Swiss-Prot record:
Organism: Encephalitozoon cuniculi (strain GB-M1)
Protein's cellular compartments: Membrane
Biased composition, class Basic and acidic residues, residue ranges: 15-31
Key word Transmembrane present: yes
UniProt-recorded name of the protein: Uncharacterized membrane protein ECU04_1080
Main location: membrane
Transmembrane segments: 81-101
Lineage per the UniProt record: Eukaryota, Fungi, Fungi incertae sedis, Microsporidia, Unikaryonidae
Length: 112
């Protein structure tokens, strides 16, 4: 029994947990008004850089670059144009299907 008492005394004691009121330094370092940067925008920017040796960029540094802003704006405009184009094509297809359905229905009604 003396051995079991000695072994229990050698166990490390747990320290009381400190309150989590301390904020992480990373949260304090980033201001709330800093704009959010999309990772896909950064990757696209890096892919479009020609002749640049260092392609490992820090997002908040890249965001300040005018070329980055221009590329992102151009990509967003292109995405809007493609979206509008797809909506137009889909609406034409739906209208075409409705017209074909009506004509087929009229043809079938005449057959009876």
């Amino acid at each position: 029994m003396a051995e079991s008492v000695a072994s229990s005394e050698s166990l490390p004691q747990m320290k009381p947990e400190e309150p989590e009121s301390k904020k992480s330094p990373s949260r304090e370092a980033i201001p709330k008004d800093m704009p959010v940067v999309n990772v896909r925008d950064i990757m696209m920017y890096v892919e479009n850089m020609e002749g640049m040796e260092n392609k490992k960029l820090i997002p908040y540094v890249v965001y300040l670059d005018e070329q980055f802003k221009e590329i992102v704006q151009k990509r967003r405009k292109d995405a809007r144009v493609v979206f509008i184009f797809m909506i137009a094509i889909m609406s034409m297809l739906v209208i075409g299907l409705v017209v074909c359905g009506v004509k087929l229905l009229g043809y079938l009604m005449e057959q009876k």
